[in-house]
């Protein structure tokens, strides 16, 4: 079958062949590979085609493969996926999620998080490094950042606020409801 033929080809040619295929067909092939090999091939592709293939993988196949990818290559593919990239981020193991978000320029990470619902964003940012979370939140609208902080656990939300300047934190907290704001501010040193 196609998978066996691709595996028999020189490894450096395979990513080029996959990106010329219909992404659905390429995803069907990639899903049947050993996760490490699939990850290797995807990260050798430009972000757009790699992201297109990731869109057509089922959640369990995506999880098996992306958790073995290089954080920078994965981050670029996730960014190229647009709104579909949010679900990939949500499914990453915690350490890889932190590595992906911190390896991308903060504006790129922010643009990915901006596409997420506030619940999805809170779920993702609770697991990110506090400094990364702070940087991302400061690049969102203060209203969206406030919504996300209210949905995060108090400890992680407080850690993110502690990594912001006083003026940045105040510009976000002013849009929060009183009770969640008080809970989070109690966590600050």
Where do the PLM segments sit?
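Hydrophobic packing positions in regular secondary-structure scaffolds
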Residues: 1-189
């Amino acid at each position: 079958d196609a998978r066996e033929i691709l595996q028999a080809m020189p490894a450096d040619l395979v990513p080029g062949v996959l990106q010329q295929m219909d992404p659905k067909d390429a995803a069907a092939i990639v899903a049947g590979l050993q996760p490490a090999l699939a990850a290797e091939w995807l990260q050798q592709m430009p972000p757009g085609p790699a992201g297109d293939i990731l869109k057509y993988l089922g959640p369990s196949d995506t999880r098996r493969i992306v958790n073995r990818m290089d954080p920078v290559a994965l981050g670029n593919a996730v960014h190229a996926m647009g709104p579909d990239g949010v679900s990939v981020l949500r499914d990453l193991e915690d350490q890889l999620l932190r590595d992906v978000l911190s390896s991308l320029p903060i504006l790129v990470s922010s643009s990915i998080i901006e596409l997420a619902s506030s619940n999805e964003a809170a779920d993702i940012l609770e697991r990110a490094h506090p400094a990364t979370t702070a940087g991302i939140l400061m690049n969102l609208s203060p209203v969206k950042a406030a919504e996300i902080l209210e949905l995060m656990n108090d400890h992680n939300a407080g850690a993110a606020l502690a990594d912001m300047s006083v003026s940045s934190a105040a510009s976000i907290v002013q849009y929060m409801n009183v009770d969640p704001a008080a809970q989070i501010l109690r966590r600050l040193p």
